[in-house]
């Protein structure tokens, strides 16, 4: 059974990055091996540019990777996951921004080939919870209703967000039982010839 240490973990923040009180930043302090995906222009979310940055970082290692994304970082992660990245093993997509707000709906429409969990909030100003549930279905992801937590960011006062950490552990477990998971991470074996 895989553990969190089996994976390289990338943190993909949204618009304006995640400040020091954001749960993503707190998780990076708790887990120093987590790597942040740095964008050149945090105030200018261009899906293709942000996605290329994430894809580049994912391809720097063959180790299976999980992405912990927030807001526009979720759209970035989905866009990257819809391309061929063999070492992407799963995604935790927290409070995704509504793709319609950024006019990128078509670019992020498709079923993911890796396990994913979408976490939505009943009062998220960036995406109504019913739409978040619909997008989770489109992506083939599990949907988790986190209650009324706003945009699930620093303003939500979540501290280290223990519930979110439990969802990350759930994602880790899903990587071993997800259809196709074994084929994604094990290299093809050459048939042996008996003499």
Feature-to-residue mapping (PLM):
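Acidic catalytic loop of the alpha/beta-hydrolase fold
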Residues: 17-18, 99-100, 122-127
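Conserved loop-alpha-helix segment in the C-terminal half of the alpha/beta-hydrolase fold
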Residues: 28, 122, 127-141
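Active-site catalytic motif of lipid deacylating hydrolases and related acyltransferases
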Residues: 2-63, 189-192
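Short beta-strand/loop motif that positions the catalytic acidic residue
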Residues: 112-113, 117-120, 124
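Gly/Ala-rich beta-loop-alpha elbow adjacent to hydrolase catalytic centers
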Residues: 67-78
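Post-His helix in hydrolase/transferase enzymes
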Residues: 49, 154-168
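Catalytic histidine neighborhood in serine/cysteine hydrolases
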Residues: 33-35, 137-153
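A conserved short beta-strand
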Residues: 86-99, 115
């Amino acid at each position: 059974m895989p553990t969190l240490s089996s994976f390289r973990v990338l943190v993909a923040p949204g618009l304006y990055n995640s400040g020091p009180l954001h749960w993503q930043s707190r998780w990076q302090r708790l887990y120093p091996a987590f790597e942040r995906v740095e964008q050149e222009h945090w105030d200018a979310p261009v899906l293709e540019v942000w996605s290329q940055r994430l894809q580049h970082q994912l391809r720097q290692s063959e180790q299976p990777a999980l992405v912990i994304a927030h807001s526009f970082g979720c759209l970035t992660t989905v866009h990257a996951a819809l391309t061929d990245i063999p070492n992407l093993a799963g995604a935790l997509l927290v409070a995704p921004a509504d793709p319609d707000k950024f006019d990128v709906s078509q670019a992020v429409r498709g079923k993911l080939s890796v396990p994913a969990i979408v976490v939505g909030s009943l009062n998220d100003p960036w995406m109504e919870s019913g739409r978040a549930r619909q997008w989770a279905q489109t992506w083939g992801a599990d949907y988790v209703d986190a209650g009324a937590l706003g945009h699930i960011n620093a303003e939500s006062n979540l501290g280290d967000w223990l519930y979110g950490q439990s969802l990350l552990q759930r994602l880790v477990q899903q990587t071993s039982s997800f259809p196709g998971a074994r084929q994604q991470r094990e290299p093809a074996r050459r048939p042996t010839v008996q003499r």
